[in-house]
Amino acid sequence: LDGSVSREFVSAEVVELERRVPDMDYLTECDNRVWGCSNKENVIYACKLGDPTNWFSYRGIAADSYAVTVGSDGAFTGAATCMGYALFFKENTLHKLYGSKPSDFQLSSLRCRGVAKGAARSLCVINETLYYLSPDGVMAWDGSIPTKVSTALDPARLRNVKSALGGALDGRYYLHLVRGNGEAQAVRLLVYDTERGLWQEEDVCSYEMAGSGGQLYLWDGKAIWAADADREENWQQAGGIEDGVSFELVSGNIGLDSPEELYLSRLTLRLEAEVKSRIEVAVSYDSGAWETLAQLTADGRRCFDVPFVPRRCGSLRFRLKGRGQLTLRSLTRTSAAAKGGILAQEVN
């Protein structure tokens, strides 16, 4: 049925010709083949080389279709391609297929934390590493064993998701999560900086995502947003750029690692406002109430040095809260002996 041969014949009976396609749950493309997995049959399929309409061509050549039965328990939860491998996930298993033709295709299975149910669309490749949501949190797979990258997040809020959607831009992993139903539904947009290992939570505007290589577009059900508006030539006419985004940064406890004969005598913050911003700097001593230290305003790009002398305490935390865009460039601590005199050097 490839159109290379034409024949005519007359038959008294009706002749039916069909080209069957397996009933598959998840698909991915790898090496000019479409790969898919079937939960009904527990089978992984590959189409004929370069022909996604032909799944049962077995002529003994390198372009043949391919199928293999897997022995792992449970349903498939996702599929992806990374570093030349076709990958198929279950919640506790990773199946990896590699090879150049059906005669040397090999299946390798690994018992590990796989893709969570309902999180098939969280799979996203960034800089040769595959990120996805597992039942235990967000994982990163670089070709060996998946490692957890979401230890800084509350694991309870990453479990039992209804749906998860992933996207990427400039080394950042965008993860949109939906948990619960109706009024109890909780929606979050998490962003992971893969180079710095930092997580942040952004305003939700991404029920759907699509990347173009140099931009990530997010659909909120009413409008399309660009993750980086500066890359859009006509963003000013769009009338929808976000400005004055609210932010809040709270540090961990400072001073718990100091020996008893030293105390924190001075703390200096160096801040840089990227755009028009309002900033409030506050401090909390020994987990007490927040006390405002300074309120800053920037009409554009500007740097601030905020020094202050903390009162004697066991530990303190500081908070940066405001609206706009702010970067904490450095944190300098100065310690002194209990009897006076500066001893320690700066620590950034």
Identify the residue ranges that each predicted region occupies.
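Generic detection of intrinsically disordered/low-complexity segments and helix-coil linkers/edges
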Residues: 3, 29, 49-52, 60, ...
